[in-house]
Regions:
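Active-site region of glycoside hydrolase catalytic domains
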Residues: 95, 114-141
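Short alpha-helical interface patches
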Residues: 77-83, 111-115, 151-165
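Chitinase-like catalytic core of GlcNAc-active glycosidases
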Residues: 1-108
Length: 176
């Protein structure tokens, strides 16, 4: 809905909320945008910079360019980096399995590398930040049963019956 309204009006409303809340800036996360929304998101980012002024921070979450899997093409990275203080790049979570067993980390290193390589010529590196998950993926009897938080993983690591494994093939750690 943030992209359906006039970008100036949306920016005005968001900047007023930042001001009245006494916040240092705004972190805007509009996930999985399509190519049809690219210009609208860029216009909103530019309007937000104008409304927030230079004394407030503007962080924009963007989906990473992908090597494999579904791509969300609603981000003009170069144009978005102009009004943004930071572009926070989200690498999609993956759940690759083989014979009902997870075989890849949630943020595969090759996807992280690809995304950063693609953005290197488009965005100043000082403007880029990378978002990686700190959760784990829980599996029971070959079925994905949910997520495990960082605190839950730490608790599992301290349990004497927990065994940890690492596979070089998939650059991924496992607990059983």
């Amino acid at each position: 809905s943030a992209l359906k309204d006039d970008p100036s009006h949306t920016a005005e409303v968001l900047a007023a909320a930042v001001e009245s809340g006494g916040y240092e800036g705004l972190f805007l996360d509009l996930a999985e945008l399509s190519s049809a929304q690219k210009k609208d998101f860029t216009a909103l980012a530019e309007a937000l910079r104008a409304e927030l002024g230079e004394d407030r921070l503007l962080y924009l979450m963007v989906e990473a360019p992908v090597w494999q899997g579904a791509a969300y093409n609603g981000y003009d990275y170069a144009a978005l980096s102009e009004p943004a203080d930071k572009l926070v790049v989200r690498v999609a979570d993956y759940g690759d399995v083989s014979e009902d067993f997870p075989i890849a980390p949630l943020a595969p290193l090759e996807e992280v590398y690809y995304a950063l390589a693609e953005l290197a010529d488009q965005v100043d590196s000082d403007c880029l930040s990378l978002l990686l998950t700190t959760t784990g993926s829980a599996w029971t009897d070959g079925r994905h049963t949910g997520q495990a938080s960082a605190a839950e993983i730490e608790q599992l690591l301290s349990a004497s019956q927990t065994k940890d494994y690492y596979t070089d093939r998939y650059a991924c750690a496992y607990l059983t």
